[in-house]
Swiss-Prot record:
Protein keywords: Ribonucleoprotein, Ribosomal protein, RNA-binding, rRNA-binding
Superkingdom classification of source: Bacteria
Family listed: Belongs to the universal ribosomal protein uS8 family.
Gene: rpsH
PROSITE patterns for this protein: RIBOSOMAL_S8
Gene3D superfamilies, alphabetized: 3.30.1370.30, 3.30.1490.10
Role: One of the primary rRNA binding proteins, it binds directly to 16S rRNA central domain where it helps coordinate assembly of the platform of the 30S subunit.
GO terms under biological process: translation
One GO cellular component, as annotated: ribosome
Name the record gives this protein: Small ribosomal subunit protein uS8
Entry-linked Pfam families: Ribosomal_S8
Amino acid sequence: MSMTDNVADMLTRIRNAYKSKLINVSFPSSKIKTSILDVLQKEGYIKDYVTTQKNNISYTEVALKYSVNGEASICEIHRVSKPGKRVYSAIKDLKGYYNNMGIYILSTPYGVMSDREAHIKNVGGEVICKVF
């Protein structure tokens, strides 16, 4: 069975790892996944990530972030734009997710960025996912 949505697979692995209270999670690497992880790290949702090679296949290992109480830094992470139904949005149409406590991750002409950064640059794009 082939995988049609690699980004959704990554988000599901991260969500399941947080539910299982795992420290690390790994999955096959790609440029778009690395860009999304850059945004998650910049916004403080994950600790760090490392890309490694195993048998000529690159894998990304993500160090998940928990609070002092052991609560996950990500409560919800969902795919918005899917291969069968792409979702595009102008920046003026994106309201703050969970009263500005969460973020949207966008793919714009200037690269992958959070909705906060997109507001500063005044640019819209494809809404990849939402994180809270």
